[in-house]
Amino acid sequence: MSIVYNKTPLLRQFFPGKASAQFFLKYECLQPSGSFKSRGIGNLIMKSAIRIQKDGKRSPQVFASSGGNAGFAAATACQRLSLPCTVVVPTATKKRMVDKIRNTGAQVIVSGAYWKEADTFLKTNVMNKIDSQVIEPIYVHPFDNPDIWEGHSSMIDEIVQDLKSQHISVNKVKGIVCSVGGGGLYNGIIQGLERYGLADRIPIVGVETNGCHVFNTSLKIGQPVQFKKITSIATSLGTAVISNQTFEYARKYNTRSVVIEDKDVIETCLKYTHQFNMVIEPACGAALHLGYNTKILENALGSKLAADDIVIIIACGGSSNTIKDLEEALDSMRKKDTPVIEVADNFIFPEKNIVNLKSA
């Protein structure tokens, strides 16, 4: 347990229909910020602040750029640690989220159409204007930092402890399902599994939505790619790139990748919300979708699940949606066919070897 994040429950979840396995949900939606990001971002901020305060020469101040959940996690951690915090969000960020961040006491600046533009503004127009003689900045990337991954890995410590307390062998765990955006959560899960010698024994199923499936595309191509635009409704998963560490881990370990459609995710979110009285956003619904659709999960794992097999789903949380948002999104999708973005038209390579890769 930490001052910046909560120990969350690992609970058995019964999904409708005939059970093909035992599902356990890790309820990261119960974090201070409503999402798993409180673990990693809180860890980064706390470690950095302790180091700066121990040095005693300057005062720590946090600077974050985010489309929502990461910025809110940073602001929430700073509220608990009594640290000043500035968050730059893009114009696409909902007013509800802007207000939530601001209500923690953080300064919120709205700039740029997308996260990358907000991040550039933060670095060039905010951070470079601070008095570096007095302030030592703590820059918070949404996902690409080892301290963030270290913080996320703590959920595996809790999972192992909870299984042990329930007298359940980790050998029964046939997979961990998580949503993948930039890869911060995924990296943390891998590092946690490595700590217990389980990384090469328990496969991870990474779930994305079509239109922000950078992880899936990178694995298919065989190298990290960058998307030109994000078209999925799961904006919390909407990053143009994954971290290099994510790609390396996925190549090293037995990771599976699943891509599902926005409409399916929204339907899952509403289904879960109505059944369990808990609002979830599409980024979280992507992982939960496999609990409702075990055939997809079994295809990803490459084997049938037995009744006593265990699958853990990370309910990663998020605070960007209301029930009304989900219902309006689904209604809009039903009125018109959502276009499928062709992968070949939506990514660029970091290197000029496309022809060689395609012919390989």
Curated annotation (Swiss-Prot):
It holds the Pfam family PALP. It is found in: Mitochondrion. GO terms for molecular function: L-serine ammonia-lyase activity; pyridoxal phosphate binding; threonine deaminase activity. It catalyses: L-serine = pyruvate + NH4(+); L-threonine = 2-oxobutanoate + NH4(+). Its cofactor is pyridoxal 5'-phosphate. The modification N6-(pyridoxal phosphate)lysine is found at residue 37. The modification N-acetylserine is found at residue 2. The keyword Acetylation applies. Disulfide bonds: none annotated. It is an enzyme of class 4 (lyase). Keywords: Acetylation, Lyase, Mitochondrion, Pyridoxal phosphate. GO terms for cellular component: mitochondrial nucleoid; mitochondrion. GO terms for biological process: L-serine catabolic process; threonine catabolic process. The keyword DNA damage does not apply. Its EC number is 4.3.1.17, 4.3.1.19. Present with 36600 molecules/cell in log phase SD medium. Belongs to the serine/threonine dehydratase family. This is Catabolic L-serine/threonine dehydratase. It comes from Saccharomyces cerevisiae (strain ATCC 204508 / S288c) (Baker's yeast). The gene is CHA1.
